[in-house]
Regions:
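Short, solvent-exposed mixed-charge patches
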Residues: 206-208
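Active-site beta->alpha N-cap acidic-glycine motif
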Residues: 1-73, 77, 81-91, 95, ...
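Catalytic domains of cell-wall/extracellular-matrix polysaccharide-remodeling enzymes
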Residues: 22, 44-45, 65-203
Length: 208
């Protein structure tokens, strides 16, 4: 099955929540459920938006508490930060996150070990829309649709200038091409796996 996921990142500052409901409405129009990675500060500032995402059927996962560089933190500092983020998110959703996208996409062995010690999995992406650079909708569409492949995780941001304009075209194009959009939890492997440099998982028996 040709599946991929839309991975939206939310930040407290400078990103706001102005287009959160617009994104929810667009995804609903295409009957799409996906995953939002939320910073704890943003969840604290916009609890109604966190609840709206959850109530619309989307996964709301962690993107840290303050968007610090995890590579520079100790194991305990990482655990404390993720715990605080999870508490802020679950206060609005009633569900404790099981996935996290590390700030800046940075991670190393000690970051991964700290996160997995909490029973969580770190998530990367393999297609970056670069919507945060305020490219026009056509450029964003071309970038995403030319790079998506089965199993892709596509990175978008809330409060990016042209994402609400680009997203319907991207969804229409990829759905018409036979793709199904699913939350990240439906893409990740539970069995032993390896991860390549793009963050894509492969069954361990296919390693090498």
């Amino acid at each position: 099955m040709r599946q991929f996921t839309v991975n939206c990142r939310t930040l407290a500052s400078p990103w706001g929540n102005e287009d959160t409901q617009t994104l929810i409405d667009i995804l609903a129009q295409y009957d799409v459920k996906t995953t939002f990675f939320v910073v704890g500060d943003w969840a604290e500032k916009y609890p109604e938006s966190v609840k709206a995402l959850h109530d619309a059927g989307h996964e709301v996962m962690s993107h840290s508490n303050h968007h610090d560089h995890y590579n520079s933190l100790s194991t305990q500092q990482i655990i404390d930060d993720v715990t605080a983020s999870n508490q802020r998110i679950s206060a609005s959703t009633g569900v404790t996150p099981t996935l996290i996208r590390c700030p800046y996409g940075e991670y190393d062995d000690h970051v991964i070990a700290a996160i997995r010690s909490m029973g969580m999995e770190p998530i990367q992406w393999d297609v970056d829309s670069l919507d945060w650079k305020d490219y026009d909708a056509e450029t964003i569409c071309e970038r995403v649709t030319s790079k998506v492949q089965p199993g892709s995780i596509v990175l978008f941001h809330n409060a990016a200038l042209h994402t609400p304009e680009a997203l319907p075209t991207i969804l229409s194009c990829l759905i018409n091409d036979g793709y199904t959009v699913v939350p990240i939890s439906q893409l990740i492997l539970d069995a032993p796996y390896t991860i390549d440099h793009t963050g894509r998982q492969f069954p361990a028996e296919h390693a090498g």
